[in-house]
From Swiss-Prot:
Name under which the protein is recorded: Probable acyltransferase
SUPFAM superfamilies: Class I glutamine amidotransferase-like
CDD domains: GATase1_HTS (cd03131)
HAMAP family in the record: MetA_acyltransf (MF_00295)
Chain's gene name: metA
Organism of derivation: Sodalis glossinidius (strain morsitans)
Length: 309
């Protein structure tokens, strides 16, 4: 699915260099089809890097996806130029009366921060409740999963004794589910989190269907029966070097991090790691776009008023 973005967005050249099909707005305007409108709530500090990662996964399918980037933290960014934010991001007030086919809520480095100490907690609460009536399907990733479980299901924050970092093996629980269609029976996916998602907790406190899990990482992929909500506790969008960057950053900050599991060649952080989860990440997002968004969203978004009931 070619993604449709601003002509000047830095991700255009970055992704084209990776042989990823990107369609600029000027070219897309010549095609007489309705593109899917997908809103990305980017909560990560390095916004350009995160844009590249998610746009890569959203790009590999036959229909147009019209991307809108959203920010809810008005503080000055230390990691992203103000010009970039002003040019390519909207505020919630700009889109609060619009409808979208899909919403992606990214992770955030906030797993050790109490929810009500998160500066933009009221804003994310507002966005998630707004999405009930304005978005066909929402995909939550890592910290966003923890936030959504608290806001939508009242589940308190659960924290691991030791940070989970590395590439872990997962196995399917529902191989015939639409979201896992085409998945291998076992597959690899990266994690980088302090949040804990025990399978028993999800089953006990929600009606969500757990689709895949890991012996080490717990529940990995789960979703609502109506396809309105999908949750991924890992980071299938990560680049090959993202975990390495986080590991070296934490070492430089004196945090004494553990070596990411099943990641560095020969467990040597001086060797360049390879991505072993890329095909899984592409298939997961393609399935979400197809079965959770495209197949159930109305052609005329003005007629959409979905509920979670």
């Amino acid at each position: 699915m070619p993604i449709r973005v601003f002509d000047e967005l830095p991700a255009v050249n970055f992704l084209r260099n990776e042989n990823v099909f990107v369609m600029t707005s000027s070219r897309a305007s010549t095609q007489e089809i309705r593109s899917l409108k997908v809103l990305i709530l980017n909560l990560m500090p390095k916004k350009i890097e995160t844009e590249n990662q998610f746009l890569r996964l959203l790009s590999n399918s036959p229909l147009q996806v019209d991307i809108q980037l959203l920010r809810i933290d008005s503080r000055e960014s230390k990691n992203t130029p103000a010009e970039h934010l002003n040019n390519f991001y909207c505020n919630f007030e700009d889109i609060q009366h619009d409808n979208f086919d899909g919403l992606v809520v990214t992770g955030a480095p906030l797993s050790l921060v109490d929810f009500h100490d998160v500066v933009f907690w009221p804003q994310i609460d507002r966005v998630l409740h707004w999405a009930r009536d304005h978005v066909t399907s929402t995909l939550f990733v890592c910290w966003a999963v923890q936030a959504a479980l608290n806001i939508l299901y009242g589940i308190p924050k659960m924290t691991r004794q030791q940070k989970l970092a590395g590439v872990y093996q997962h196995h399917l629980l529902k191989p015939h589910a639409l979201l896992t269609r085409g998945f291998d029976e076992t597959f690899l996916a990266p994690h980088s989190r302090n949040a804990d998602f025990p399978t028993a907790m999800i089953r006990q406190h929600t009606d969500l269907e757990i689709l895949a899990e890991s012996d080490e990482a717990g529940a990995y992929l789960f979703a609502s029966h109506d396809k309105r909500l999908a949750f991924v506790t890992g980071h299938p969008e990560y680049d090959a070097l993202t975990l390495a960057s986080e590991y070296h950053r934490d070492r430089e900050n004196g945090l004494n991090p553990s070596l990411p599991v099943n990641y560095f060649l020969q467990d040597n952080p001086d060797l360049t790691p390879k991505a072993s989860w890329r095909s899984h990440g592409h298939l997961l997002v393609a399935n979400w776009l197809n079965y959770y968004v495209y197949q159930i969203t109305p052609y005329d978004l003005r007629r959409m008023n979905p509920t979670l009931e």
